[in-house]
């Protein structure tokens, strides 16, 4: 099972916090994620410019370099390569996967977001997919239609590579995506200060060891249940 944390440092710091404060909070949460054995961290800070994103990418590289946790950068292939990231996660409007493969080093991970079976064609050549939004999620407040378990199952059946579910995957829903054949799940809200995380130097950070342990246990148990 693969567990992927998708970042949003705005959830960790006080409203209107400076970039420096957000950086410090993300560094603290990253330490908890690595300690918990999170498999993959996706740096996704859509409101930041390339310069600030590069700073966070360098921090993540330093925090994960000697660990089993890998990290990828959302969309910005240039930032990912410059930081020595393990890979990039592409969106539908990102650089095509084939073009990206031409300029990345061997072993570089390329992930792709998909929202339907039809989109898997454009994702050919990816190492893994993130499929969603599966369930209602606070991270997508304006969305009214969801992929659902059957939509996730169809995407899993359509491709030969691992598929991670995203969107409202927590609690018993971990078992739902396991039974649909997903290789794991990705999440923002579950990992990024949304549950009244402890205040640590002004940051709402969450100690993740029990969260990750519970998710793995539930996924592995239900993945083998007929």
Question: What is the predicted function of each stretch?
Answer:
Residues 183-189:
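Acidic, Mg2+-coordinating phosphoryl-transfer loop and its flanking beta/alpha structural elements
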Residues 128, 132:
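Short beta-strand-loop elements within alpha/beta enzyme cores
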Residues 43, 109, 138, 142, ...:
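Residue-level signal for pocket-adjacent positions within structured domains
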Residues 90-98, 133-158:
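Flexible, gly/pro- and Lys/Arg-enriched active-site loops
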